Every structure is written in structure tokens, then in C-alpha cells.
Amino acid sequence: MARSLKKGAFADESLLKKVDALNAANDKQVIKTWSRRSTIYPQFVGHTIAVHDGRKHVPVYVTEDMVGHKLGEFVATRTYRGHGKDEKKSR
């Protein structure tokens, strides 16, 4: 079920404060966050945000095309190792 339009998009308050502080200082630092559920706002564009994938922080450079999506969409949490090989085919 989608979020109500009257509520607006969600973004973690601490993440917004960090981005606004970097924008005010005109600084480009990597912002580390665990908030995969945060929506990407237009003021995030041009920043690199390190999003947690469950074991490490993966850097994501935010572009204009990402606005409106969630941070977690751009970092995979599971590694796909492929399906098992058939012993008969390998001989």
C-alpha cells in the first residue's frame, strides 16, 4: 500500500540535517547512513551517501534520476552466486 500524499515522502531527520549542513558549507563528504527507507530528495543530488547493506556501507552517488526513489533500492542486500551446475553437463 502506498504512502498517503498528504503525509509526504519520508526521509530520516538526521540524514536531512547532514545533507543541509553540507549544502550550506558547499562541502562534498561521504554521508554514512543506515536509513535505507529514506526517500531521495532533490537536495541530495550530487552527494555520495554510504548506505548500509547489512554488513558494510556501499557508496551511492545520487543523480537527478534517483529523486523520489528509496536509498535501499540502489544497494543489494543479497549476493547471487548462481544456480548449481549439473555434473553430467560438465563432463
UniProtKB/Swiss-Prot annotation:
InterPro entries: Ribosomal_uS19, Ribosomal_uS19_bac-type, Ribosomal_uS19_CS, Ribosomal_uS19_SF
GO biological process, one term: ribosomal small subunit assembly
Gene Ontology CC terms: cytoplasm; small ribosomal subunit
Record flagged with keyword Ribonucleoprotein: yes
GO molecular function: rRNA binding; structural constituent of ribosome
Keyword Ribosomal protein carried by entry: yes
Keywords associated with the record: Ribonucleoprotein, Ribosomal protein, RNA-binding, rRNA-binding
Protein family according to the UniProt entry: Belongs to the universal ribosomal protein uS19 family.
NCBIfam families: rpsS_bact (TIGR01050)
Function: Protein S19 forms a complex with S13 that binds strongly to the 16S ribosomal RNA.
UniProt protein name: Small ribosomal subunit protein uS19
Organism this protein belongs to: Lachnospira eligens (strain ATCC 27750 / DSM 3376 / VPI C15-48 / C15-B4) (Eubacterium eligens)
